[in-house]
Amino acid sequence: MENPRMPFEIIEIGAVKLDKKFNIIDTYSSIIKPKLYKKLQPHIKTILNYDESTLRKGRPFDMVYREFIKWCGEDYIFGTWGSMDLNILQTNMDYYYLKPMPVPLKFYNVQQIYADMYDEDGKIVKLKKAVEHLKIEVEEDKPFHSAVNDAYYTGLVLKTMSPRDLADRYCYDIYNNPKDKKDEIISHHKHYLEHISREYHCKEEAISDIELMAPICYRCGKRLSPKVK
């Protein structure tokens, strides 16, 4: 039965660390022993390179997470293939009452960046297809659907880009929204201005916020006058 506090349980954390030129300089990988969902779903079994016997040898999530964050270091930014990884990670963190991540959490959605740069229609594709399109070698001992291997290939996709390509393409995970005015985010991108506001108790409170209801045009810097129904 699904637990509403943690619908998806993380069973593996894998990552690669990149330098400023997107060279892989370190890796992290650890299997997690599940607490809630100890039996793998059939469709999950078909794509993983291990089974329940491997999971039983894993370590608790909170132990692995603390080790992983320590490995990340002080100055880092996440890059993920898709937008859901950080959301699921934070759901698991909440279940174990771990200290929340910074709010809002800045990261690079490499899947979306790839789509914007390499697909005329901006179509989202799976990691394997992107790797094939970029003619990145798939190593025999690094099959897909392993957290650390998928991170490895995501890193190689980034390697085909330059830091300048990513300068304006960051986004924010808003699993935890800003709670106060001082924590709000106003970020200037090349083609738009992003404003992540604090939470409001009701619609009337939001409407009464002049800065929220009259956003700034990213081109001219003037405030707009939107209509609210």
Language-model features: locations:
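Active-site-proximal helix-loop-helix substrate-binding element of RNase H-like nuclease domains
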Residues: K45, E52-L55, I113-A151
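Acidic two-metal-ion nuclease catalytic site recognized across multiple nuclease folds
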Residues: V157-K229
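AAA+ P-loop ATPase catalytic core
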Residues: N92, A147, A151-M161, D165
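Conserved beta-strand -> loop -> alpha-helix junction used to position metal-binding or nucleic-acid-contacting
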Residues: M101-Y114
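Residue-level signal for well-ordered alpha-helical scaffold segments within enzymatic catalytic domains
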Residues: E67-K70, N87, T91, K129, ...
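A short secondary-structure junction motif
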Residues: T91-Y97
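Conserved non-catalytic scaffold segment of RNase H-like nuclease domains
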Residues: M1-Q90
